[in-house]
Amino acid sequence: MKASLVQLSTQPLVTEREWTEDGIPVLTASCSLPQPVKPQGAAARRVRRYYQLQRRFFFRYCEAWLLPQARAEYHAALAASRPLPCFRAELGYRVTWNQDGLWSLYTHIRETCPGGPPLLGRRGDTWDLAAGYPVPLKAFFPGVRSWKGTLLAFAAGEIARQEAAGVARYHDHWRQALRRHFNPQNYYLTEDGLAFFYPMYAIAPTVEGTPVFTLPFGTPGLRQPAAQTPQ
């Protein structure tokens, strides 16, 4: 019987594109996503295809959504004799867990548009290397029906603590927003615990970026990653 992968070896694959108007750059895009470094079985092939598809979607998004805005801003600036703007989009990633048969990471996108703050986005992925498929969040709470409530209560406690200490600021209606904007796909594993996050603007002002809460391993009901991996 062929042994399952315990870790996944990858390297960044970087791709860049530039769009011009009248020979002037109006939009640049940079994409850095993981790529398995050598044949490692079906799981590695699925990972490769998954991030190849994400790369294509990113550049299609840039061309279909950002490029028309960039061209419009360019012509408006040209007509008003203002400095010519250039939009920028960056997609990158960070591997946060790579052991015990699980590979976890988040990808992050940053859009820089003239006249406004950078827009940030994040996506979490956790892969079961034995099965070759993503692991649903609830799999880390076996037998716990109220796992969502556990996460929401933890986030609420962290927000109350941060606001009391004056280290962060959240919307006045953050308690309702926590439940409304909770997405079980927005998580990844770290050495400290299970990190789950909310989109920019969803529960906090722009200055707070992407709010992240990390439920520590050892919390009742949260399964340790090593125990998640099939033997």
Residue ranges and their predicted role:
Residues M1-Q231:
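Compositionally biased intrinsically disordered regions enriched in Thr/Gly
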